[in-house]
Amino acid sequence: MGRAFEYRKARIMARNSKNSKAFSKFSKEITMCAKASGADPDNNSRLRVLIASAKSAGMPKDTIDRAIKKATDKDTSDYKEVTFEGYGPFGIAIVVETATDNNTRTVANVRSYFTKFGGSLGTSGCLSFLFTRKAVFTVKAKDGIDMDELELELIDFGVDELYKDDEDNTITAYGEPDCYAQMQQYFEENGFEIVSAEFTRIPNDTKEVTAEQRETLDKLLDKFDEDDDVTNVYHNIKEDEE
């Protein structure tokens, strides 16, 4: 362990969407999960943690219930998760995750955003070496928790990085993507309240840009954020120190 500082900074690399966008993302994920593995959270561990994450984000219960119900509706479109990779202007690497019911539309839109700002859409996997994919759980810290002891326990459950945020009294754990289920199992069985659980991509290195370049890149990233099919956007722009 030892990359907690870089991981904390990397959270800023993921574009944080407004509530309406976040709720739309949760709705799609909940519907897809319920459709794939069942609508009963007691028997669908992934759905259970998605619901907990949505609630922590302030998503209304009736909105969550509608998303689950959509999974049993025959008229509900089948969403497919598709990841796009490409270079934006100034050589910035960008990974765009989507959930779409019309891949032709989504490909055309994503390609147009890259092209409009002087970038280019690459082939699948072309940027995999620039990012590390992780499973991330954030839980409420228990009173008097011994972080050293917790860290030692979590190593056996696939966690390779852990840090505590004293400001909001939470603990965030990072592990390999295939350790997601066992990480969830540990936190649930040991009585931790799960605030959020997700997969993320952490840039292995970041690239400095000028203020003018950052302004252009922000416009491109905003275009991705505004697209209803887009669920997550990751990049390797160095964090603005100001």
Regions from the PLM with identified roles:
Residues 136-242:
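Positively charged, low-complexity, intrinsically disordered RNA-binding extensions
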Residues 1-113, 118-122, 127-136:
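N-terminal cationic and glycine-rich segments that engage phosphates or anionic surfaces
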